[in-house]
Each structure stands twice: as structure tokens, then as C-alpha cells.
Amino acid sequence: MNTLRMRRTVLAVTAAAVLPVALAACSSDDGGKEKASDSGSSSAPKGSTSKSMDPMAGPFGPACSTVPKEGKGSFDGMAQDPVATAASNNPALSTLVSAVKKAGLVDTLNNAENITVFAPTNDAFDKLPKDQLNKVMNDKEMLTKILTYHVVGQKLTPQQLENGSYPTLEKSKLTTSGSGTSYKVNDVSNVVCGNVPTANATVYIVDNVLMPTK
């Protein structure tokens, strides 16, 4: 009897010692799973963050820093208006806007759908000899020809500028080349602020006026 009682006592003590260890092991396993799950879920957004930081997803180029940060002339403001109206709110494009008005192209540009406009800056127009600029600005037919040469009838992404040739509204073609954030039009005009969205167009601001070949 004493022997039997002793065996029962030993078994009880052993069970009391083993049970907490087993419970602790289970608890540790669950915690490890939770930590693994937490680390997995926390790493998920990293891919989307890097994607949203793609520099080609928005406007690019050295002259973009001169665009107003707020108001209708800002990138957000321009995106709400059709292209001629959007350009009129950008101080760096005032000469272009004046030319568009003289040529009677405001409604044409504002009512067009899914176009690309290569928009010369004020400095680009200033590069033209003064007598030539005055002549062009006072010749509606010539002015219309030049301005419509800056418009392509489809929205172009930066990638499509890498090695492109596109018919313009003027009918003749212009060429584009480059990569990354550096592009040229007709090998003579640099894109200084590109991929600017408006309500109906994508705008690439350029540093030279483009001239039709014919």
C-alpha cells in the first residue's frame, strides 16, 4: 500500500511539473505565429509605396519647380481645366496663350479629346528674332500652322517619347527621343517640364518653338 501511494505521489508531482512546460511551449508557438503574421502584413505596403514613388508617375523636369504650388496655375489646378485654360493660368506660358488667342484656337484646344501639347515657354518665344516673332504673331495662317504643329492627336506617355514619330494637327510629323526624365523634340527642343496633366491633354513644356518642316 505504501508503495502504491508513493507511485501515485510521484506521478502527480511529475504531471504538475510537465503541464506548465507544455502550456508555455504552446504559448510560445502561438506568439511566433502571430509575430510572423504581423511581420508579413507590415511588409505588404512596401511594394505599393515604392510604386507610388515612381518619378515618371507625375510631372518631371527642371522647370517644374517654377510652377505655382497652389491655385489654378498649380499642377492640381491645371488638371481640372482643359488645356488652353490651364495654360492661361501658368505665367511661364503667357506668350503661347496670347498666340493661341490670336490664332483663334482656344476652343479648338479646349474641346479636343486626349491630345498632347508641346508648349513653348516665354523664353522659347524670346529666342526667335524679334522681327520674325512679330511677323508670325500678325499672320494668322502662319501662326495657326506653327501652333497646330505643337499638338499631337493622342496622349503620349514619357515612355512613348523615347523613340517616337507622331503626326501633328498641322499634318506633318514631329519626332521625340530620350529616356528617363530627359527628352528632346525634333532633336532641338528640350522637355523642361513634362507629363503635366490637364482635363483633356498631357502637356510637355519645351524650351524652343517647333517649326513645321513644310
Write out the residue ranges for each language-model feature:
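Mature, structured domains of secreted/extracytosolic soluble proteins
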Residues: 2-214
